[in-house]
């Protein structure tokens, strides 16, 4: 029963990731209709791209963690909850960014818009760093458990070695 609930939660988490990605794309497309100062702001583009990086950490690494025998189903559920929380926060940042790209927000000055963009950029950068840290710590837990069993090569084969992107 517990594994069925965990599997259900994981599917919901993945669906949430897809939803957030689609929101980000919609907001980015809406930038085409906004003042040149904001539309050309590199930070807006980077903020949206960072969501893709966060989603990539989740999708690529959590899929590997699901096949890792060093994690229990309860631990995988907790890890999925951690990623979900980060993705929800990233979705909130995109909602804040929506204020900038929303044409009906005519009362905002360019400075107000740039302040919102800057705040969103900083928060998304923090969330991206948090996601990398969270992923690396979970992989290191698996590695330490594998080390106790003299099975580190399997973990390296699964996640890659230290020279690779995620850890």
Give residue spans per PLM region.
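Short, mixed-charge, low-aromatic patches
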Residues: 8-20, 45-52, 73-75
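Primarily heptad-repeat coiled-coil rod domains in cytosolic scaffolding/tethering proteins
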Residues: 5, 39-42, 46, 74, ...
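Long amphipathic alpha-helices with heptad-repeat character
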Residues: 17, 21, 48-51, 124, ...
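Start-of-domain marker
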Residues: 1-40
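Extended amphipathic alpha-helical interaction segments
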Residues: 51-123, 127-133
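A cross-kingdom marker for long, charged
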Residues: 138-167
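Extracellular, luminal, or virion-exposed ectodomains of exported proteins
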Residues: 34, 39, 43-47, 63, ...
């Amino acid at each position: 029963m517990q594994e069925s609930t965990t599997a259900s939660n994981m599917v919901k988490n993945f669906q949430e990731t897809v939803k957030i990605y689609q929101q980000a794309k919609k907001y980015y497309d809406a930038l085409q209709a906004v003042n040149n100062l904001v539309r050309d702001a590199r930070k807006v583009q980077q903020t949206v791209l960072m969501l893709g990086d966060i989603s990539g950490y989740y999708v690529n690494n959590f899929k590997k963690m699901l096949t890792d025998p060093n994690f229990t189903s309860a631990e995988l559920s907790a890890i999925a909850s951690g990623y979900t929380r980060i993705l929800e926060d990233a979705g909130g940042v995109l909602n804040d960014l929506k204020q900038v790209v929303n044409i009906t927000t005519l009362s905002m000055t360019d400075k107000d818009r740039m302040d919102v963009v800057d705040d969103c950029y900083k928060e998304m950068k923090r969330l991206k760093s948090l996601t990398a840290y969270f992923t690396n710590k979970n992989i290191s837990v698996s590695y330490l458990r594998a080390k106790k069993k003299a099975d580190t090569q399997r973990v390296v084969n699964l996640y890659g070695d230290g020279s690779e992107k995620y850890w």
